[in-house]
Amino acid sequence: MEKLTEKEKELIRVSWESLGKDKVPHGVIMFSRLFELEPALLNLFHYNTNCGTIQDCLSSPEFLDHVTKVMLVIDAAVSHLDNLHTLEDFLLNLGKKHQAVGVNTQSFAVVGESLLYMLQCSLGQGYTAPLRQAWLNMYTIVVAAMSRGWAKNGEHKTD
Protein backbone atom coordinates (compact mmCIF):
# COMPACT_ATOMS: atom_id res chain seq x y z
CA MET A 1 0.00 0.00 0.00
CA GLU A 2 1.34 3.42 -0.99
CA LYS A 3 2.26 5.96 1.64
CA LEU A 4 1.53 9.65 1.95
CA THR A 5 4.14 12.24 2.84
CA GLU A 6 3.94 14.00 6.19
CA LYS A 7 3.01 17.23 4.41
CA GLU A 8 0.17 15.50 2.55
CA LYS A 9 -1.14 14.04 5.80
CA GLU A 10 -1.06 17.46 7.42
CA LEU A 11 -2.92 19.08 4.51
CA ILE A 12 -5.60 16.39 4.59
CA ARG A 13 -6.04 16.52 8.37
CA VAL A 14 -6.29 20.31 8.55
CA SER A 15 -8.76 20.53 5.67
CA TRP A 16 -10.90 17.68 6.99
CA GLU A 17 -11.01 19.15 10.49
CA SER A 18 -13.52 21.80 9.43
CA LEU A 19 -15.42 19.63 6.95
CA GLY A 20 -15.66 16.55 9.12
CA LYS A 21 -17.71 18.31 11.79
CA ASP A 22 -20.74 18.63 9.52
CA LYS A 23 -20.44 15.66 7.19
CA VAL A 24 -23.85 15.28 5.58
CA PRO A 25 -24.10 18.67 3.77
CA HIS A 26 -20.62 18.13 2.33
CA GLY A 27 -21.58 14.60 1.32
CA VAL A 28 -24.69 15.92 -0.41
CA ILE A 29 -22.50 18.29 -2.45
CA MET A 30 -20.30 15.34 -3.39
CA PHE A 31 -23.20 13.11 -4.43
CA SER A 32 -24.96 15.93 -6.30
CA ARG A 33 -21.82 16.28 -8.39
CA LEU A 34 -21.52 12.50 -8.78
CA PHE A 35 -25.05 12.27 -10.20
CA GLU A 36 -24.35 15.26 -12.45
CA LEU A 37 -21.28 13.52 -13.87
CA GLU A 38 -22.77 10.01 -14.01
CA PRO A 39 -26.59 10.15 -13.87
CA ALA A 40 -26.89 6.38 -14.42
CA LEU A 41 -25.58 5.83 -10.88
CA LEU A 42 -28.88 7.14 -9.54
CA ASN A 43 -30.42 3.83 -10.67
CA LEU A 44 -28.31 1.95 -8.11
CA PHE A 45 -30.18 3.58 -5.25
CA HIS A 46 -33.41 1.60 -4.97
CA TYR A 47 -34.38 2.73 -1.49
CA ASN A 48 -37.86 3.62 -2.59
CA THR A 49 -39.81 4.60 -5.67
CA ASN A 50 -39.41 8.28 -4.78
CA CYS A 51 -35.73 8.19 -5.76
CA GLY A 52 -36.49 8.96 -9.40
CA THR A 53 -34.84 12.38 -9.49
CA ILE A 54 -31.57 13.57 -8.05
CA GLN A 55 -33.34 15.89 -5.62
CA ASP A 56 -35.72 13.14 -4.45
CA CYS A 57 -32.76 10.87 -3.84
CA LEU A 58 -30.69 13.51 -2.06
CA SER A 59 -33.51 14.24 0.38
CA SER A 60 -34.41 10.60 1.08
CA PRO A 61 -33.59 9.54 4.68
CA GLU A 62 -32.19 6.24 3.39
CA PHE A 63 -29.92 8.02 0.96
CA LEU A 64 -28.78 10.52 3.58
CA ASP A 65 -27.85 7.49 5.70
CA HIS A 66 -25.70 6.27 2.79
CA VAL A 67 -24.11 9.73 2.48
CA THR A 68 -23.28 9.59 6.20
CA LYS A 69 -21.66 6.17 5.77
CA VAL A 70 -19.54 7.38 2.84
CA MET A 71 -18.41 10.40 4.83
CA LEU A 72 -17.53 8.11 7.74
CA VAL A 73 -15.33 6.04 5.41
CA ILE A 74 -13.50 9.24 4.45
CA ASP A 75 -13.30 10.10 8.14
CA ALA A 76 -11.80 6.68 8.89
CA ALA A 77 -9.20 7.13 6.15
CA VAL A 78 -8.25 10.56 7.50
CA SER A 79 -8.06 9.15 11.03
CA HIS A 80 -5.74 6.37 9.84
CA LEU A 81 -3.42 8.37 7.58
CA ASP A 82 -0.38 7.11 9.48
CA ASN A 83 -1.43 3.49 9.01
CA LEU A 84 -3.89 3.21 6.13
CA HIS A 85 -2.92 -0.45 5.77
CA THR A 86 -4.99 -1.20 8.89
CA LEU A 87 -8.10 -0.39 6.82
CA GLU A 88 -7.19 -2.92 4.11
CA ASP A 89 -9.72 -5.61 5.10
CA PHE A 90 -12.46 -3.04 5.59
CA LEU A 91 -11.76 -1.48 2.17
CA LEU A 92 -11.56 -4.88 0.45
CA ASN A 93 -14.98 -5.69 1.89
CA LEU A 94 -16.32 -2.33 0.78
CA GLY A 95 -15.12 -3.04 -2.75
CA LYS A 96 -16.87 -6.43 -2.69
CA LYS A 97 -20.11 -4.79 -1.58
CA HIS A 98 -19.92 -2.23 -4.37
CA GLN A 99 -19.31 -4.94 -6.97
CA ALA A 100 -22.27 -6.92 -5.62
CA VAL A 101 -24.69 -4.01 -6.09
CA GLY A 102 -23.52 -3.26 -9.63
CA VAL A 103 -21.03 -0.43 -9.22
CA ASN A 104 -18.21 -0.68 -11.75
CA THR A 105 -14.65 0.32 -11.00
CA GLN A 106 -14.80 3.21 -13.50
CA SER A 107 -17.33 4.86 -11.20
CA PHE A 108 -14.68 5.01 -8.46
CA ALA A 109 -12.84 7.63 -10.55
CA VAL A 110 -16.02 9.71 -10.86
CA VAL A 111 -16.50 9.51 -7.09
CA GLY A 112 -12.94 10.81 -6.74
CA GLU A 113 -13.71 13.74 -9.05
CA SER A 114 -16.84 14.43 -7.00
CA LEU A 115 -14.86 14.34 -3.76
CA LEU A 116 -12.39 16.88 -5.15
CA TYR A 117 -15.28 19.05 -6.35
CA MET A 118 -16.84 18.99 -2.87
CA LEU A 119 -13.50 19.95 -1.31
CA GLN A 120 -13.11 22.82 -3.77
CA CYS A 121 -16.65 24.11 -3.10
CA SER A 122 -16.36 23.72 0.66
CA LEU A 123 -12.83 25.01 1.20
CA GLY A 124 -12.89 27.89 -1.28
CA GLN A 125 -9.53 29.70 -1.17
CA GLY A 126 -8.16 26.94 1.06
CA TYR A 127 -8.37 24.50 -1.85
CA THR A 128 -4.86 24.60 -3.30
CA ALA A 129 -3.01 22.45 -5.83
CA PRO A 130 -0.94 20.71 -3.10
CA LEU A 131 -4.12 20.04 -1.08
CA ARG A 132 -5.86 18.63 -4.16
CA GLN A 133 -2.90 16.35 -4.84
CA ALA A 134 -2.78 15.15 -1.23
CA TRP A 135 -6.48 14.20 -1.30
CA LEU A 136 -6.07 12.60 -4.71
CA ASN A 137 -3.17 10.51 -3.41
CA MET A 138 -5.16 9.36 -0.38
CA TYR A 139 -8.20 8.57 -2.50
CA THR A 140 -6.02 6.58 -4.92
CA ILE A 141 -4.78 4.43 -2.03
CA VAL A 142 -8.32 3.84 -0.75
CA VAL A 143 -9.68 3.00 -4.21
CA ALA A 144 -6.81 0.62 -4.95
CA ALA A 145 -7.82 -1.47 -1.93
CA MET A 146 -11.52 -1.26 -2.82
CA SER A 147 -10.74 -2.29 -6.40
CA ARG A 148 -8.87 -5.36 -5.17
CA GLY A 149 -11.95 -6.32 -3.16
CA TRP A 150 -14.20 -5.58 -6.12
CA ALA A 151 -12.12 -7.87 -8.37
CA LYS A 152 -12.09 -10.66 -5.76
CA ASN A 153 -15.88 -10.60 -5.56
CA GLY A 154 -16.47 -11.65 -9.12
CA GLU A 155 -15.45 -11.46 -12.70
CA HIS A 156 -13.54 -8.25 -13.34
CA LYS A 157 -15.79 -6.12 -15.53
CA THR A 158 -15.08 -2.58 -16.60
CA ASP A 159 -18.41 -1.53 -18.05
UniProtKB/Swiss-Prot annotation:
Heme b binds at residues 66, 98. One of its GO terms (biological process) is cellular response to hypoxia. The keyword Lipid metabolism does not apply. The keyword Cytoplasm applies. It catalyses: Fe(III)-heme b-[protein] + nitric oxide + H2O = Fe(II)-heme b-[protein] + nitrite + 2 H(+). It is an enzyme of class 1 (oxidoreductase). SUPFAM superfamilies: Globin-like. It comes from the Eukaryota. InterPro entries: Globin, Globin-like_OT, Globin-like_sf, Globin/Proto. Keywords: Cytoplasm, Heme, Iron, Metal-binding, Mitochondrion, Oxidoreductase. Its main location: cytoplasm. Transmembrane segments: none annotated. It is found in: Cytoplasm, Cytosol; Mitochondrion matrix. Its EC number is 1.7.-.-. GO terms for molecular function: GDP-dissociation inhibitor activity; heme binding; metal ion binding; nitrite reductase activity; oxygen binding. Residues 3-151 form the Globin domain. One of its GO terms (cellular component) is cytosol. Monomer. Homodimers and homotetramers. Mainly monomeric but also detected as part of homodimers and homotetramers. Monomeric globin with a bis-histidyl six-coordinate heme-iron atom through which it can bind dioxygen, carbon monoxide and nitric oxide. Could help transport oxygen and increase its availability to the metabolically active neuronal tissues, though its low quantity in tissues as well as its high affinity for dioxygen, which may limit its oxygen-releasing ability, argue against it. The ferrous/deoxygenated form exhibits a nitrite reductase activity and it could produce nitric oxide which in turn inhibits cellular respiration in response to hypoxia. Belongs to the globin family. This is Neuroglobin-1. The gene is ngb1.
